[in-house]
Amino acid sequence: MEINRLTLPPCGGPGEVTTFYSFESGAARSITLADSAVLLASRKNATTPVLMIDWDTEAPGLHHLFPSRDERYEPARAQAGRPGLLEYFEACGEQLEALGRTGGDDHEERARLVLEAIDWEAYVERVDQGRTLYLMRAGSFDDSYGERADRMDWDGLFAACPALFRAFAAHLTRHFRHVLVDCRGGRSAAVSVCTTLLPDRLVGVFTPNPRSLEGLAGVVTRAIDYRCSHEEAQRPLLVYPVPCGVDGFDAERRLLWRRGDPHKGVAGYQPRLEQLLRDCYGIAQLSLDNYLDEVQLHGALAAGAVQHLGALPERDADRLSQTRAIEALLGWAA
């Protein structure tokens, strides 16, 4: 069967890129992104175009949450054979090699030539026929996937064309109101691409484990420092820290985790986040009281013990529901 072209007209104005990051707890991060995507794509009578990108090439998972609903593919066609992010940037690398010194030191021009030579729509699939919701999966999961993912040289692509990733983001936001990037955890070149070069917004999910918040703080600091020190990257980066508790936390333990208690030797996450953002943005006064009163994710997300909203028959509007938690986040971040 011939694959029909996926045609997405340009949006009325540029969209925005939001990266979802967690130093650990990838399940919470991915489900938070998936739920956000469903709610955003439901806006304006389900006509808001949203693209999810699975950049966690080591442990990809968004394709499991969103089985393809793309009419270009035969039902029997194995999901393993569908191209995605990895194949797209393999093609970018090949184009850069073919260009040689074409464009010289004009990296913006080189990025334009590379991106115009690749049909990005071939790497994107529709995953919800009721909404304009799309996915660029991590890659084609054939026998060579693991080796190719390990071999992907994100630093090398950046060195060959520093404008490539920034231009890639701008390229996609001409067609999608929201581009949501599922970034792998830890620290790596891929993490730097996703948190420093691509986004307009960074949603950082963290758990009570101290290293979770420490890891997030390090990524935020490096991203903002880079943008402040590199002229071509000087654009705002809005940071939205998102606490994800643990099942069994009662009100007292949640408050202790949030506010801390010097007498018990507990440093709360709110004062640490407020100091982090004051230092990063160079502002004297900052309070997260109102924001953190509303934006808190359920502990079950950290264990991946809940279904994402797209898999549920209907959205639950209960005050303590998953839907309300994500809607509260989007009320601030989107």
Q: Model segments located where?
A:
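Extended hydrophobic secondary-structure segments that form protein cores and membrane-embedded regions
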Residues: 18-20, 51-55, 134-137, 238-245, ...
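Catalytic cores of eukaryotic secretory-pathway lumenal/extracellular enzymes that build
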Residues: 27, 39-41, 164-165, 183, ...
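Short secondary-structure boundary/capping segments
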Residues: 33-37, 65-81, 85, 152, ...
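C-terminal lobe/tail of nucleotide-utilizing enzymes
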Residues: 1-7, 226-334
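P-loop/Walker-type NTP enzyme "switch/lid" segment
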Residues: 57-170
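Walker A/P-loop phosphate-binding motif and the immediately C-terminal alpha-helix
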Residues: 11-58, 64
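Conserved catalytic-core segment of NTP-binding enzymes
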Residues: 160-281
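Conserved acidic residues
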Residues: 133-134, 177, 200, 294
